Every structure is written in structure tokens, then in C-alpha cells.
């Protein structure tokens, strides 16, 4: 699915007719809920969380604000790679890596939790 999306993007242009630059980020994980983590989430009418269930983690869930990129730290094996890729792609920004597993456990990450609230 990711490769199909990449092929579609490669064939598109922005409103000024420029090719879209694609920056590939590594995939963390696979990451899963531990039994302790799954049991520690308050029950709600949303999705249940089960031990061993895979977490939906992505380095693309970052936030750009005031000359900084706030990047979720997800996996010690791939965090540094993601930081380097984004720093090279966005040299005018300071990359700030933030431990964010607790946010990930509830679903989503930095970009998701900073979205606007409609009036």
C-alpha cells in the first residue's frame, strides 16, 4: 500500500507544477502493547487494547511549529535514522525528539494530539 501511494505521488505535481518531493522515513517496531500497558488503559467506548496487539506507530506523526520539528521517539533501533533523515530534509528546522510511548498507547501521537478543536 505504501509503495502504491508513493507511485501515485511521484506522478503528481503541486499547484505550481513542481514535482512532489518524497522523503522516506523508516518504520519503527513492530511495537506491541505489554500486558501491563494494556491493563493500565482506562476502559472507554473506543477501541479495546489487548496485550500483544500491535501499536500503530509512525515517524510521520510529527509536528512542525516555530522553526522546530517535534518528532516522536518510537524505537531505539530507528529513532536516530528518522532524526537524520528529517534533519537532512528540513535543515532550516531544529529536530526535537520526544519520548512518546504513553501517547502512542492511547492511539495516535504528537501530530494527532495537537490538532485543533472545532468551535
Predicted feature locations:
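Histidine/cysteine-enriched polar flanking segments
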Residues: 1-119
